[in-house]
Amino acid sequence: MALLQISEPGMAPAPHQRRLAVGIDLGTTNSLVAAVRNSIPEALPDDAGRVLLPSVVRYLDKGGRRIGHAAKEEAAIDPRNTIVSVKRFMGRGKAEVEGAANAPYEFVDAPGMVQIRTVDGVKSPVEVSAEILATLRQRAEDTLGDDLVGAVITVPAYFDDAQRQATKDAARLAGLNVLRLLNEPTAAAIAYGLDNGAEGLYAVYDLGGGTFDLSILKLTKGVFEVLAAGGDSALGGDDFDHLLFEHVLAQAGLEAAALAPEDVRLLLDRVRGAKEALSAAPQARVDVKLSTGEKLAQTITRDTFAALVEPLVQRTLGPTRKALRDAQVSAADIKGVVLVGGATRMPVIRDAVAKYFGQPPLVNLDPDQVVALGAAIQADLLAGNRSGGDDWLLLDVIPLSLGVETMGGLVEKIIPRNSTIPVARAQEFTTFKDGQTAMAIHVVQGERELVSDCRSLARFELRGIPPMTAGAARIRVTYQVDADGLLSVFAREQHSGVEASVVVKPSYGLGDDDIARMLEDSFKTAEVDMRARALREAQVEAQRLVEATEAALVADGDLLDASERATVDALVASLRALAPGDDADAIDAATKALAEGTDEFAARRMDKSIKRALAGRKLDEI
């Protein structure tokens, strides 16, 4: 039975002349993808109409995996193989990840970035993030009807070089061309500014699942200038969950170390649900039955929760004060405060922001979607889809100073924090000893004065310096930061012209060979993924055809004689029985049989409709 496909207004594929690009918010708790369609940025939903994809991946044996909602629902029954909040691990070693000791995972000793052992092998945070990004890419291509030319992916403003590079590697592994990495508060400002025609000084308070950012922006006639940025890449909604989790355990006289991993995950899920419920209700219940048979039942009031998390709320105000000082403005100068991130729905956060800035925060845009919407606008522009009203300029900044190690383990800052990017700065250095023919250059990031207190980004050597007395050689070191906030360093000896350079790829243990291996692994599972996709498509088409045929039989079953009706009923029953199975070829064959078996029925229905439409009308009226 042939179908006529009609798109809802605004849901048709983009015109062929537009280059399809999307904005992706790769979040700690949830992720989403957005695109500009008919000049309006919108979040793209999945088949069930949900725009948020839980940032959860469950690994199964034999290469299987669950991603998003399905994985989240199974986290409590298989916590060791279900990776949540992976964004906290990006570009980080185990010692740098807060709460790693309480996580249910088996961590693997590896240089640099932490690794997690699963039933499907050892996985890096880059691989886990790539699964999420690939799912969003597929959603976008299915919705938009064509391949993507690229994506703008958002990152916390306070992400350092290692975390940014890890994000780009994950995108590359997911088959995405990264047009730009965009700071999340800046993306929110783009969405808010363009949507509201806002001008003046604005603060963007971004509290997500695992990170906190505070940016001060100046919006003037299409120019988005970031004046200062601050934050904490290890503070987010997850920390509020863990505080409440510890409180519930303490009230019950239990310790986390004594719980089974399944119970830890289950209780964390219940606690998170209670936290979210407290945003709308004065109290919430936590009811859990542990694997030991013990039951926990507690009532949490909003006041109790507010008192419990007050230290975390105050932690967000420290970077806020610092950013205001860096921008040389006061809280009274701020015209509006834009809230970003699901954690900002908590009344305790909104009350604290309102009190600090002396005004209620702006909440007219969905805090879960605003970052992705802004990224979509930037992606559309970078893809070349410029229209008359798109003449605007984005001036972003680097969140942390970039420097070089000098004698004594000191840091000489080359590019100070809050410098507008892209940017290049140079400084001259000299040799320390007579006859010195080489110089080791150690690139660091941070605000501290000692190298040991900053993050090491890269090391390289400049060799071939002509032997001279100490202090005679002149070595010019140039730091260059691109629009993604990623760094390249060049060194040149001025007398001889010898030079060396490095594109900083942080030492988190993921090299080109690792990327190649991961890509090869993804190719190996591509056939399995395609088979799963084909089966799902066959099941959906079968269900659609069964429902359409049954509706037609109810409306016009009298057009068939008893024998014909029996044949159609048998075809419908056969397809309905096969549809839930896992044989895509059999489902396709049954679908084709039903479609062909109802062709004559469809023709009779068409004749009936035409006769009904023409009944009582004269020839000259037609």
UniProtKB/Swiss-Prot annotation:
Keyword Chaperone: yes
Matching InterPro entries: ATPase_NBD, Heat_shock_70_CS, HSP70_C_sf, HSP70_peptide-bd_sf, Hsp_70_fam, ISC_FeS_clus_asmbl_HscA
Signal sequence range: none
Any one GO molecular-function label of the UniProt entry: unfolded protein binding
SUPFAM superfamilies: Actin-like ATPase domain, Heat shock protein 70kD (HSP70), C-terminal subdomain, Heat shock protein 70kD (HSP70), peptide-binding domain
A biological process from GO: iron-sulfur cluster assembly
Superkingdom, taxonomy of origin: Bacteria
UniProt entry keywords in alphabetical sequence: ATP-binding, Chaperone, Nucleotide-binding
Gene3D superfamilies: 1.20.1270.10, 3.30.420.40, Actin, Chain A, domain 4, Substrate Binding Domain Of DNAk, Chain A, domain 1
UniProt family annotation: Belongs to the heat shock protein 70 family.
HAMAP family in the record: HscA
Record function comment: Chaperone involved in the maturation of iron-sulfur cluster-containing proteins. Has a low intrinsic ATPase activity which is markedly stimulated by HscB.
Name of the protein in question: Chaperone protein HscA homolog
